[in-house]
C-alpha cells in the first residue's frame, strides 16, 4: 500500500459527495485523510486487477466499486492523489460514479464502513487551509467561484484563488515593515544624521501604502457587487408601472399587475443578470399616504429598502404632472445613483401653461 501523507491536526479520514445532489450523469465522491488510500484500495477494483494506489497518481483508472462481498456496485473511474499534491494536501481518492442518488448513497456508505466519517460542510477546503495549501483569502475564493453568477465575477474569483490579492496584501505588509525599520533606526541611533532622509523615506512609503489601500478598497466594492449583486430598488407612487417594469425585465409575470392602485403591498425580490453585472432587483409597494394598515407596512418596507439601495430606479407616470408623492421620492433618492423612467409615454401629460 502507498505511504500515507497528511499534515492535518486530526488523523480522521473524511468522505462526501462533492457534486450537486440529485439525479445526473456523473457524481463524485471524495475521500481525504490518512486512510484514504487504504479505503480506495478496498473499495475499487480496476479492470487491470491492480490496486488503485499501484497506478500512477493523478491519472483516472477504469474499474468498479465493490462491496465487502466483492459484488459490483457501479462502473466508475477512480483517481488517487498522493498528498501533499492534492486539494487538501492529504492523500485523496476521488470516485466518479453514475450520478443516481442510490449509487452515490451506497458508495458513500461503504466508505463509512471502511473507516471514513462524513465530512462537515466546507471541511475539504478547511483542511486545505489548515494544511497550508491555500490561505484564507483563497479559501473564500473557492465559494465565490462556486457561486459566481457572471463571467466577470468568475474571473475575479479565479484571480483571488490564484493568490493575486494575497500577493498585494503581502506586499503591503512588507512596505509597512520597511517603514517600521526606518523609524526604529531614527529612534535607536539619534546621533546619526539620518532623520531627514528617514522622514522622506517614511513619507513616500506611507503615501504608497495609502494609494494601494485606496485601490484595494475601490475594487473591493466592485467585487462585492459582482459577488452579491447590485441592490436595485424600483420605487414610485402607486400604479405608475413598477411591477410591469419588473415583469418586463424578468420576462415573466412575477408580480401581479392591476389597474387598481396599491396592488403590490410587500417587497418582491428577484435576481437578474444585466450584461456582466448581477442585480438584486426589488419591486416595492407604491409610496403614498394611506390609512390602510397593511399598505402602511408595505410603504414602510419600501422606504427601508430604498435607504439601503445601491441603485434606485424611479418610475414616474408620464400621463400626469409631478405631485407631492413624486417629489418626496425624488428627494429620497437625491445623492444616490439613480435611473428615472417616465412610463405611459403614449399618454404624455403636457401643461397648458
Positions of PLM-derived features:
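Conserved G1/Walker A P-loop phosphate-binding module
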Residues: 215-291
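A glycine-rich (often HGG/GG-containing) alpha/beta subdomain
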Residues: 1-155, 159, 163, 339
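Flexible nucleotide-interacting loop at or near the entrance of a catalytic core
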Residues: 151-235
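Short, conserved loop/helix-junction motifs that constitute active-site signature segments
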Residues: 331-335
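Substrate-gripping "pore-loop 1 plus following alpha2 helix"
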Residues: 293-301
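Conserved small/polar residues in nucleotide/adenosyl-binding loops
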Residues: 349-353
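Conserved Switch II/interswitch segment of TRAFAC-class P-loop GTPases
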Residues: 309-323, 347
Amino acid at each position: 500500500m502507498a505511504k500515507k501523507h497528511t499534515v492535518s491536526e486530526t488523523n480522521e479520514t473524511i468522505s462526501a459527495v462533492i457534486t450537486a445532489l440529485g439525479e445526473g450523469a456523473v457524481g463524485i465522491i471524495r475521500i481525504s485523510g490518512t486512510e484514504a488510500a487504504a479505503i480506495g484500495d478496498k473499495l475499487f477494483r480496476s479492470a487491470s486487477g491492480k490496486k488503485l494506489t499501484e497506478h500512477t497518481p493523478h491519472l483516472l483508472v477504469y474499474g468498479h466499486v465493490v462491496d465487502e462481498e466483492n459484488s459490483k456496485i457501479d462502473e466508475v473511474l477512480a483517481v488517487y492523489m498522493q498528498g501533499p499534491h492534492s486539494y487538501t494536501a492529504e492523500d485523496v481518492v476521488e470516485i466518479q460514479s453514475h450520478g443516481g442518488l442510490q449509487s452515490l448513497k451506497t458508495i458513500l456508505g461503504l466508505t463509512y464502513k471502511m473507516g471514513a466519517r462524513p465530512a462537515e460542510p466546507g471541511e475539504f477546503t478547511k483542511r486545505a487551509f489548515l494544511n497550508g495549501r491555500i490561505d484564507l483569502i483563497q479559501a473564500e475564493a473557492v465559494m465565490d467561484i462556486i457561486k459566481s453568477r457572471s463571467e466577470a465575477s468568475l474571473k475575479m474569483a479565479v484571480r483571488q484563488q490564484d493568490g493575486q490579492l494575497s500577493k498585494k496584501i503581502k506586499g503591503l505588509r512588507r512596505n509597512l515593515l520597511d517603514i517600521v525599520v526606518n523609524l526604529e533606526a531614527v529612534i535607536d541611533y539619534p546621533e546619526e544624521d539620518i532623520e531627514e532622509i528617514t522622514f522622506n523615506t517614511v513619507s513616500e512609503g506611507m503615501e504608497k501604502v495609502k494609494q494601494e489601500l485606496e485601490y484595494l478598497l475601490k475594487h473591493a466594492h466592485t467585487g462585492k457587487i459582482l459577488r452579491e449583486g447590485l441592490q436595485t430598488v424600483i420605487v414610485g407612487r402607486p400604479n405608475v408601472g413598477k411591477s410591469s417594469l419588473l415583469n418586463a425585465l424578468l420576462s415573466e409575470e412575477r408580480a401581479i399587475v392591476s389597474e387598481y392602485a396599491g396592488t403590490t403591498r410587500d417587497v418582491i425580490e428577484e435576481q437578474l443578470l444585466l450584461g456582466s453585472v448581477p442585480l438584486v432587483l426589488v419591486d416595492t409597494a407604491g409610496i403614498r399616504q394611506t390609512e390602510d394598515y397593511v399598505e402602511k407596512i408595505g410603504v414602510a418596507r419600501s422606504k427601508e429598502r430604498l435607504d439601503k439601495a445601491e441603485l434606485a430606479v424611479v418610475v414616474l407616470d408620464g400621463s400626469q404632472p409631478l405631485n407631492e408623492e413624486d417629489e418626496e421620492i425624488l428627494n429620497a433618492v437625491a445623492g444616490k445613483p439613480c435611473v428615472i423612467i417616465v412610463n405611459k409615454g403614449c399618454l404624455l401629460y403636457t401643461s397648458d401653461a
